[in-house]
Amino acid sequence: MARKKASIDFEQSLADLQALVERLENGELSLEDSLAAFEQGIALTRDCQGALAQAEQKVQILLERDGELAAQPFDAEPEA
C-alpha cells in the first residue's frame, strides 16, 4: 500500500506543478500570488525530484547482480 501511496503522491505533485505552471504562464496572477505560486512550485519540484531519486535507487537495487551493479540504460520504447 505504501508503494501505491508514494506513486499517487508523485502523480498528484506533478499534476499540481503543471497546474501552477499554467496559472503562472497565464499572467493573470498578482505579483504576490505569483511569488506564492512560484514558492509552492519549487517545493513541489523538490518533492518530485526526491521521489524520482528514490525510484532510481530502487531500480539500481533491483538490477544489482552478484554484488555488482549492472547498470542498464532505460529503453522507453520496447523493441519490435
Curated annotation (Swiss-Prot):
EC number of the protein: 3.1.11.6
Quaternary structure (record): Heterooligomer composed of large and small subunits.
Classification via InterPro entries: Exonuc_VII_S, Exonuc_VII_ssu_sf
Family statement: Belongs to the XseB family.
Highest taxon of the lineage: Bacteria
Recorded GO CC terms: cytosol; exodeoxyribonuclease VII complex
SUPFAM superfamilies according to UniProt: XseB-like
GO BP terms in the entry: DNA catabolic process
Subcellular localization, as worded in the UniProt entry: Cytoplasm
Enzyme class label: hydrolase
Pfam families linked: Exonuc_VII_S (PF02609)
HAMAP family cross-referenced by the UniProt entry: Exonuc_7_S
Keywords: Cytoplasm, Exonuclease, Hydrolase, Nuclease
Catalytic activity annotation: Exonucleolytic cleavage in either 5'- to 3'- or 3'- to 5'-direction to yield nucleoside 5'-phosphates
Record's protein name: Exodeoxyribonuclease 7 small subunit
One GO molecular-function entry: exodeoxyribonuclease VII activity
Predominant location category: cytoplasm
Protein's job: Bidirectionally degrades single-stranded DNA into large acid-insoluble oligonucleotides, which are then degraded further into small acid-soluble oligonucleotides.
Keyword Nuclease assigned: yes
